[in-house]
Amino acid sequence: ASLQAGPEAGYRPVTPRLEDAFIALLGGGPGGDSTLAALMPDHHSTLQQGPVIEAQGLTKRFGDFTATDQVSFTVQRGEIFGLLGPNGAGKSTTFKMECGLLRPSAGQAKVMGYSLSKSPGKARQQLGYMAQKFSLYGNLSVEQNLRFFSGVYGLRGRAQNEKIARMSDAFGLKSIARHAADELPLGYKQRLALACSLMHEPDILFLDEPTSGVDPLTRREFWLHINSMVD
C-alpha cells in the first residue's frame, strides 16, 4: 500500500474538546519556546536533499501471518509524518523495520540515504527511536539511563557529562537523577525516554505512540518539544 501525501498544512477553526476546556481551567498549559531547541544542533545545512526516510514495498511476515504488506512512503526533511491505524495494523512493525530492529521479509528501508540492510550501522547513527513502552532500564537511575544510552552512541568523558547535565535541565530531570526509572510517574518516564533518544543528536527521530496514557498537560509539553526541533 503506497501512502499518498496529504493536503497542504493549514489552520481552520474546530469545536473545542473536553481536553481543551480542562487545559483552559489550568491556565492554558505549556507555551512559549522549548529550551530543547537551543540544545539540538541545526541540521539544516547537512541534511541531504530529497527524502530522508524511505519505505519501499516493506513487507513483514511472521509465519503465515502478514503484518505489513507492500508499504511504501517517503518523508521529507522537516516533516512530522505519522502513521494512523487501529491496533494490529502494523504501525510498530513498520517503525521497527525503518529503525533496523526488524528485518523485512521483502522491500527496503532507508534513512538519510543509507539502506538498513546494507549499511545498518550508518543508518542507525542518524536516527533516534522512542519506543511505545519507552525502552528504559527500570532498575537503573535516571542519570544511569542517560549515561547508558549516550554511551551506546559513543559519548564519553566530559562531552557525555555536559550532555547529561544539559538534557537533565531541559527535561526537568535534575531533581530525580538518582530515582530508578521504574519508580517514575508515566510523564517523567516519557521525558526520560525522549531525552535518551536525543542524546546523540540524531537527524531523524522515530516516535512510537509517544503520548499514549499520559495526561493532557504532559502531552502538550511533549509536542512543544517536538515542534521546536522541526527545521
What do these predicted regions represent?
Residues 6-10, 14-60:
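ABC-family P-loop ATPase nucleotide-binding domain
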Residues 53-231:
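ABC transporter nucleotide-binding domains
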Residues 1-2:
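N-terminal accessory interaction module
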